[in-house]
Amino acid sequence: MYHTPVLLKEMLDILSPQNGGIYVDATFGSGGYSRAILNSADCQVYAIDQDEYTYTFYEKLSHDFPNRIHFFINKFSKIQQILNNVQIKKVDGVVFDIGVSSMQLEDASRGFSFSKNGPLDMRMSTSLSGVDARMFVNTVSEVEIANVIYQYGGEKYSRKIARAIVNARNKNMINTTGELASIIRSVVSRSKNHSIDPATRTFQAIRIWVNKELEELEKGIACAANILNQGGKIIVISFHSLEDRIVKVMFKLLCDGKSVNLLNLGLGFQLINKKIIRPTAEEIHSNPRARSAKLRAILKL
């Protein structure tokens, strides 16, 4: 399955790839952004993804753009280390597309989806990540489960859901996404005028916790800012308010010249778009996943 890149035209317009430029696609996925960048200019792309399953998409791009795409299976918080290892000190742009991809959601064996029964995993990487969702729901205390569901999912029934999870695991270990979704639905009903499944926020929260997504995002932006050439850009596409809040705060710190993740980068950044860029109605119609997407971008002066 191919993951349709969101806000692709808007990303390209801002990044404006140049011949001879060096760009980082920090969330490679199926390579949609990388392909667009490589098509736009005679440039180099260094692509990163922690998901081992994305390697096959890299192979296709490598065939189409020989010697211009370079791929690394790692977390994007390691951008600086990855590039240092290949003697790249500065780049002209870094692009992040945050969150879970369509490919990951559609593959039941990955354990991300509450609509497809599969093993309760949710790890973006089976080699780089530690605790999976199964271990979380079966071993973490009721209080912490409730806190995670509330903090990362904004779920107002977090305590009720946590209690139901603990009650269920006391009888039998929770092993599948279907089991977990059923437990949640047994205590939280779908509201009459709302199409969102009652399991949505809880699954999001557990996924964020398992993959340390918000911590990784902070580190990734800080490292990206540290490797930009003058005129270089960071572009972040996020899909929910927790991610967007981190991007907004990090960009403000950079523009204000504040220390970011122990990196004192000094003054020299400015926002490219004062207002959030959102997908058009046409894009949302053709790709409903784009509905909640928000793009923010920053420039190194």
UniProtKB/Swiss-Prot annotation:
Compartment list: Cytoplasm
Catalytic activity: cytidine(1402) in 16S rRNA + S-adenosyl-L-methionine = N(4)-methylcytidine(1402) in 16S rRNA + S-adenosyl-L-homocysteine + H(+)
Top-tier EC class: transferase
UniProt cross-references to Pfam families, sorted A to Z: Methyltransf_5
Sequence positions that bind S-adenosyl-L-methionine: 31-33, 49, 76, 97, 104
One GO biological process term: rRNA base methylation
Record-linked Gene3D superfamilies: Putative methyltransferase TM0872, insert domain, Vaccinia Virus protein VP39
GO MF, one annotated term: rRNA (cytosine-N4-)-methyltransferase activity
UniProt entry tagged with the keyword Iron-sulfur: no
SUPFAM superfamilies, per the entry: Putative methyltransferase TM0872, insert domain, S-adenosyl-L-methionine-dependent methyltransferases
Keyword annotations: Cytoplasm, Methyltransferase, rRNA processing, S-adenosyl-L-methionine, Transferase
Coarse class of the protein's main subcellular location: cytoplasm
EC numbers: 2.1.1.199
Membership in a protein family: Belongs to the methyltransferase superfamily. RsmH family.
Function: Specifically methylates the N4 position of cytidine in position 1402 (C1402) of 16S rRNA.
HAMAP family given in the database record: 16SrRNA_methyltr_H
The protein's name: Ribosomal RNA small subunit methyltransferase H
Species, as recorded: Ehrlichia ruminantium (strain Gardel)
